[in-house]
């Protein structure tokens, strides 16, 4: 019995371990909580803006937010794709190569973040006009957008390090960093919005400074000597081959992020058409709660992916089967629980954001009761996409994400209202998750022989 067990401490978990349900939950729990805190950024902004600033400004924030996520989504691509590559290299016993690849990913993230910042600030106004922002919303969209986009590089770094901290066997450090970033955002929201009355500019600045904490603290950690599996090299590098491979492999996460943002824009367009600004506000509340619920599935996927990549790289196919079986069971179990919670708590969730407006509250509560059924299969679909990314099959992962978010959901948002009116918009996501689950199951069965799970 080792010293840790004699002292009553839990044995540290390694990527090379065999994983029971308890061990799997223990390892992924920090990344799950980490993603929940990350999702709270927008939620806290929304709470303060809706209750302190006003309904029109709340609609403006929700309207421009998808475009901001498109820019920052490249961080998810680099993080998930790069982590799969680095974890496989660690599984093959090549730590030096893993560190060099890791350094290239971080260097590329910073460079791309700066480029996207310049582009985003330049085009934010015409994009908002093109997407149909009302005259009352346009200035709020531009103010919130420009300030938030200024922090794109930090936002991308935060997304990248969320994945790499799990691969470095430091998920608890990732949790600490994200909690610190979330608390920074929440406290500054209170100061800038409720205290200084800076409105949307204050909300955006609070979010941006929170992202600086989330992006810079891990950067400092990996630049200094540390006891993790990964270490940034002193000299920045941009090795094109692994960068392209990581981007290709992680394209599903980028695709999912962009597609989600595009579909959100489509939702806003349809809601403005059918019921006006109140529809956009109601959808914003749904998105905030969905951010938190889906963060559980995304956090699990981020946490389990380096384990999958490691065992695939080590050719331990027995453990690969074990990870798949347990992960699918967990995803479906959590899906049932989240669906039940969402249906039962639709009223309280709506009241927190829009309790000040009776008609908007009624609309939001009804919408959420329909929207809630989507949580049943969402976690399964997210895991399946992440599973194929971890195996290095970015094409299948991207196809699942593309069909799930863009094709199935976009077509449902357009077609269902023709038959079900406004309720068709709220049912669209559930229909898309059902169709995506069929596709995900087909790919899992079709690829069994190739990946030996």
What are these regions (language model features)?
Residues 31, 35, 47, 84, ...:
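Transmembrane alpha-helix boundary and packing residues in multipass membrane permease domains
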Residues 79, 147-166, 174-185, 203-218, ...:
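Short runs within selected transmembrane alpha-helices of multi-pass transporters and secretion channels
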């Amino acid at each position: 019995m080792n010293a840790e067990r004699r002292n009553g401490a839990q044995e540290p978990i390694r990527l090379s371990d065999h994983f029971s349900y308890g061990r799997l939950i223990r390892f992924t729990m920090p990344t799950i909580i980490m993603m929940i805190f990350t999702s709270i950024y927008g939620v806290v902004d929304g709470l303060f803006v809706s209750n302190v600033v006003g309904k029109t400004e709340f609609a403006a924030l929700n309207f421009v937010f998808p475009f901001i996520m498109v820019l920052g989504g490249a961080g998810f691509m680099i993080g998930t794709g790069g982590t799969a590559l680095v974890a496989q290299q660690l599984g093959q016993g090549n730590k030096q190569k893993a560190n060099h690849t890791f350094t290239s990913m971080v260097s590329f993230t910073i460079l791309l973040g700066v480029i996207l910042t310049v582009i985003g600030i330049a085009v934010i106004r015409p994009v908002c006009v093109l997407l149909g922002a009302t005259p009352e919303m346009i200035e709020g969209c531009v103010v919130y957008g420009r300030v938030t986009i200024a922090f794109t590089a930090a936002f991308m770094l935060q997304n990248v390090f969320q994945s790499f901290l799990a691969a470095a066997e430091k998920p608890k450090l990732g949790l600490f960093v994200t909690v610190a970033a979330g608390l920074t955002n929440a406290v500054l929201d209170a100061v800038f919005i409720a205290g200084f009355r800076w409105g949307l500019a204050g909300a955006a600045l609070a979010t941006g400074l929170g992202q600086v904490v989330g992006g810079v603290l891990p950067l400092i950690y990996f630049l200094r000597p540390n006891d993790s599996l990964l270490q940034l090299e002193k000299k920045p590098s941009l090795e094109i081959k692994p960068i392209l491979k990581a981007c290709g492999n992680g394209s599903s996460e980028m695709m999912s992020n962009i597609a989600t943002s595009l579909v959100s824009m489509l939702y806003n367009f349809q809601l403005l058409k059918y019921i006006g600004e109140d529809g956009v506000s109601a959808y914003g509340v749904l998105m905030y709660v969905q951010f938190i619920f889906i963060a559980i599935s995304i956090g699990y996927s981020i946490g389990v992916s380096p384990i999958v990549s490691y065992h695939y790289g080590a050719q331990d196919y027995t453990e690969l089967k074990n990870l798949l079986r347990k992960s699918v069971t967990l995803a479906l179990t959590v899906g049932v629980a989240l669906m039940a919670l969402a249906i039962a708590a639709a009223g309280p969730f709506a009241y927190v954001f829009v309790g000040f407006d009776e008609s908007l509250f009624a609309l939001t509560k009804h919408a959420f009761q329909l929207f809630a059924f989507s949580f049943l299969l969402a976690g399964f679909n997210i895991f399946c996409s992440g599973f194929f990314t971890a195996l290095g099959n970015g094409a299948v992962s991207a196809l699942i994400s593309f069909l799930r978010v863009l094709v199935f959901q976009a077509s449902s948002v357009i077609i269902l209202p023709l038959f079900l009116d406004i309720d068709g918009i709220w049912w669209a996501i559930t229909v898309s998750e059902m169709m995506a689950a069929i596709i995900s199951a087909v790919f899992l069965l079709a690829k069994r022989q190739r990946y030996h799970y």
